[in-house]
Amino acid sequence: MERVLGKSGTHTHFRGNECVSPIYPPIDFQSLLGRDAWDSLPAPVRRRFGPHAAEGLSTLYEGEMEVRANPFGRLVAQACRLIGTPLAPWTGGAVPTSVDVHLDPRGGLVWARTYAFTGRAPVLVSSTKLMTDRGELLEVVRGGLGMALTVTAEDGALHFRSRRYFLTLGAWRVTIPGLLTPGRAHVIHREASGGTFRFTMTFDHPWFGRTLFQDGLFRDPA
């Protein structure tokens, strides 16, 4: 169990009986990666994750996704609908998908993904990346569920890997045992060609294997 603390306000605090939301510093991916690793990334990747991303600008990417899940992954995705749909609840191929990246008022960056599964209403899956003043990168969704992430640059691509899952309860982050999660998350952002990039996301569970898989090609806005 971890108390959410921080000198710059990255902690939940109270004003009287009112719980005040934390304010997080802007995400600086260059600082998280280190200068050499950052410079090894293609210019379009640096542009998408560069300082402009923290200036309040909204960017819309459109493309198609392949969305797959094994039985355990489908069970977890459906159960998570109780806390705001942090995982796509359906599967399909060539699913039209849009991603709106914009600033969160608390200082993080929101990735709002809208999936248009055939025969179903559009599904919004939203998560927010936050950086604490201790330099820890977090990704959180509704209901207080989140992951602590590591970010690396490998072979010209940006990689995000989960280190642990947690549930935020008031001023505390409670670690969730790995066996009770969809598994270790691994997200890859890789430059493609012609103003496009590939987004790949996998979850691997120690008992249930590859629980969730998503892969898609997205276009930069004109």
Predicted features by range, described:
Residues 217-222:
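Short beta-strand-to-coil "C-cap" segments at the C-terminal boundary of structured domains/repeats
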Residues 4-5:
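Leucine-biased recognition of intrinsically disordered, low-complexity hydrophobic segments
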Residues 14-16, 116, 208:
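Intrinsic structural disorder/low-complexity segments
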Residues 204-210:
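Exposed beta-sheet edge/beta-hairpin loop segments within beta-rich domains
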Residues 21-193, 197-203, 214:
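Soluble ligand-binding/transfer domains with enclosed cavities or grooves
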Residues 10-12, 16-20:
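Targeting/processing segments of secretory and organellar proteins
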